[in-house]
């Protein structure tokens, strides 16, 4: 069953690590949309995604060496 992505069920998070552009490209290849992404500094992105995609974001980040922190709805 394919769960729809509802626009009001989103989550914001902070991502830290090196080569953040690669993270965004990895998400795109995996079909995980980012609703917004803003660079806070050289090694930090502040992002938003659909809540249903957050577990996949965490999994990809962990596999590739990035850290997802400050998760909030």
Give the predicted meaning of each segment.
Residues 1-73:
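Immediate N-terminus of the mature polypeptide
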């Amino acid at each position: 069953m394919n769960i729809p992505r509802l626009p009001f069920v989103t989550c914001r998070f902070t991502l830290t690590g090196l080569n953040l552009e690669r993270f965004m490209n990895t998400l795109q290849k995996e079909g995980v949309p980012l609703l917004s992404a803003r660079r806070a500094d050289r090694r930090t992105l502040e992002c938003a995604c659909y809540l249903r995609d957050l577990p996949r974001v965490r999994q990809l980040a962990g596999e590739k060496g990035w850290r997802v922190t400050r998760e909030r709805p």
